[in-house]
Structures are given as structure tokens and as C-alpha cells.
């Protein structure tokens, strides 16, 4: 399911039974496994990957080449790395 005002660039893979809430932005080549849930106002950078059953909280910024291996439950943060770690809050 894809919400309202979601922007997706070319080359993305969205797995089955995934939910993308409103106002999200996906750059190119984002790869989501099945059963993922992306909160509203999330931004996913180039080549970001999310494991199956992954959850991304509202307002999360995932930088390029970041691997989400654990659920991100704290909203409005910037994440980077493989595996992802929180760098700072979104202000």
C-alpha cells in the first residue's frame, strides 16, 4: 500500500505486503523486502536497503548506502551506515 504524496525515483524494489505512509520520498535503487512499514515523512537515500518486516518511524532520514537491519522506532532521526546507526535528530 502506498500513501498520498509519495515520490519514488526509478529503480526501486518494494516487497510484497509493504506499507508506505503519506509524504515519503524514495530516491533511486531503494530495496525493501516484504512486509515493511515506512512511517510518514520518511526519506530513503540511494541504495538504502531494508530487511523483511522492517519498520521505519515517522520522519526518519536514511542516508545513501545504509542497511536497515533493525527496526527504527524513534521518530525524526538521521541514520547512516551498515548496519544503520542514529547520527542525530532531525530539527
Where are these regions (language model features)?
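Glycine-rich hexapeptide-repeat left-handed beta-helix
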Residues: 21-22, 27-91
